[in-house]
Design a protein with these regions (language model features):
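Conserved AdoMet/S-adenosylmethionine-binding subsite of the radical SAM
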Residues: 80-87, 96-217
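Short, solvent-exposed loop/turn segments at secondary-structure boundaries
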Residues: 17, 59-60, 183-186
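Short, Lys/Arg-rich amphipathic segments at extreme N-termini
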Residues: 1-24, 194-196, 202
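Conserved Radical SAM active-site core
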Residues: 2, 6-9, 21, 32-128
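A structure-centric signal for secondary-structure junctions around beta-strands
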Residues: 19-21, 42, 146, 168
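Aromatic-flanked redox-active Cys/Sec active sites in thiol-based oxidoreductases
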Residues: 27
Length: 217
C-alpha cells in the first residue's frame, strides 16, 4: 500500500533539474517530523514548509499496488506523444519510507525517468535516475552519494563543510524559507548568508525555489 499526499504536473522548481516538466508524487509521512505544528519544536527538521500529512491533497490517495500508482502517475503526464521522456519526482515527507523496487520497476515500465528528493537518512534503492539528497540538521546521513546534494542554509547543525567530501556531482545551497517562521526583516538573512557562502566557496551553487517565484505548485 502506497500513501500519497498529492500528485500533480508542474515544473521542477529547485536544484539542477529546475525548470523541467515533471509529475510530482508526494508521499505521506516523514521520519524527521510528524507534520503537526505542535511537534515542530521537537522535530529533527523544524523548518519544513510542506504539508505531507494524510492523503487528502490533489490527486492524493492510497494505492494498493505499484502498478496502480504507476498508472495514476502516467495519467497526470499530459504529453505522451511529444517524444520527450516523462519525468516523475518522488518527494515527501520522506519518499524512501515507501518507494521500493516494485514501484521503480512499474514506473520505468511506463516510460518515466525517476527523480527522488530525500533527506538521506535511509539508503536509496537501485534504479533511481536522479537522486537529490537534502540533509537535515544532525539527522544521521546514510545516503552519502548521489547526483546532487542540496542543503537548506543556514542550519546550525548542518554546516556546508560537513558534506564537501561526499560523493555527489553537484553541491547546492538553498536559502531557508522562513516566511512562516520569522518577522519580515529577518527573512532576508538566509538569502544573504547563502549568496555570501556560494561566492566565498565556489564549489557550492545557489538554488532558489523558482516555483514559488513563478507562483506554481
Amino acid at each position: 500500500m502506497y500513501s500519497v499526499k498529492e500528485a500533480f504536473y508542474t515544473l521542477q522548481g529547485e536544484g539542477v533539474q529546475a525548470g523541467r516538466a515533471s509529475v510530482f508524487c508526494r508521499f505521506a509521512g516523514c521520519n524527521l517530523w510528524s507534520g503537526r505544528e505542535q511537534d515542530r519544536a521537537s522535530a529533527q527538521c523544524r523548518f519544513c514548509d510542506t504539508d505531507f500529512v494524510g492523503t487528502d491533497g490533489q490527486n492524493g490517495g492510497r494505492f494498493a499496488t505499484a502498478g496502480a500508482l504507476a498508472e495514476h502517475i502516467t495519467r497526470l503526464w499530459p504529453h505522451p506523444h511529444e517524444g520527450v521522456t516523462p519525468y516523475v519526482v518522488f518527494t515527501g515527507g520522506e519518499p524512501l519510507l515507501q518507494l521500493d523496487a516494485a514501484l521503480i520497476e512499474a514506473v520505468h515500465a511506463a516510460g518515466f525517468e525517476i527523480g527522488v528528493e530525500t533527506n538521506g537518512t535511509l539508503a536509496a534503492p537501485d534504479g533511481i535516475d536522479w537522486l537529490c539528497v537534502s540533509p537535515k540538521g544532525n539527522a544521521p546521513l546514510v545516503q552519502t552519494r548521489g547526483d546532487e546534494l542540496k542543503l537548506v542554509h543556514p542550519q546550525t547543525d548542518a554546516p556546508p563543510e560537513r558534506f564537501e567530501g561526499l560523493d555527489f556531482d553537484h553541491f547546492l545551497l538553498q536559502p531557508m524559507d522562513t516566511s512562516g517562521l520569522m518577522a519580515s526583516d529577518a527573512r532576508k538573512e538566509p538569502l544573504s548568508a547563502t549568496v555570501a557562502h556560494c561566492m566565498a566557496h565556489p564549489r557550492w551553487r545557489l538554488s532558489l525555489q523558482t516555483h514559488k517565484i513563478a507562483g506554481i505548485d
